[in-house]
Each structure stands twice: as structure tokens, then as C-alpha cells.
Amino acid sequence: GGTLAVLGDRLLDADPDYGREAGFFLYLGSRIGPAARNATAILPVAGPGEADGTFVNVEGRVQRFHQAMQPPGVARPAWMVLARLLREIDPGRAAVRDVRAAFAALASTTPEFTGLSWRGLGLKGAPLSAAAPAGSGAR
């Protein structure tokens, strides 16, 4: 099979054989559920409260969250791990050195985030762009 990458989902409801047919199964998470144990490679990422980042709430507003504690061991923010993986795949890719640059990269490549900036989110966040394609799941 092909490559399967799972980010952050503990796969608690997944079949115990989940991912076994993949040629390469990469799991990135802060907690490992039973199905994640089938992964070819596991990369630890910081969990909630262990990194700065953003989320989209149920009203479709993008909001920032801030690190409250240090992640355990060698876990790093998901944006950092993904940025390093992308640099390995494409060495010519520009380096992403902080969460603000990661958000800028997202906003420059994802229609739903067009026009948004880390600073512009402020304390109350901002709505996703009206440019979100129909059926994209963006609210």
C-alpha cells in the first residue's frame, strides 16, 4: 500500500488492524492508542497546552492558544515536526522557524485562511475566509 499519516488522533475507535496494509504508516501524536502501535514510525508531538497554535471553533472562528506547560521528553509542536518533515522531502522549501511563520504558510496555501494573520487573530480570533470552497467542511 501507500503512505498513511495520522496527526493527533488517538485512533481509539479504529480497528486493531488499522494501518497494517499501508506501505508506510506514520503516527504523530501525544498519546498512543492501540491502533497507533501498528505504525512504521511514531513521532511525538506536543499535546494540548504544550505549544502555541490555532484552532477553528464550532462557529468557524480561528483562535490562538498558548503554551501552558512544557511538553514531555522530545515532543515538539506539530507545526515544527511537519515543517521538518517537509524540508526532508523538499530541501528547497523555505524553513518555518516559529508558529507565526507556520500560520503564515497555512494562510498562503489554504483558501479558508486567506487574508488571516497570526497578529490579526488577536484575542478574539477571526472568521474563516468566505473563500472556503463549498463542501470543504470549513465553517
Question: Residue locations for each model-derived region?
Answer:
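Non-catalytic alpha/beta scaffold blocks inside enzyme catalytic domains
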Residues: 1-119
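Long, compositionally biased stretches
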Residues: 115-139
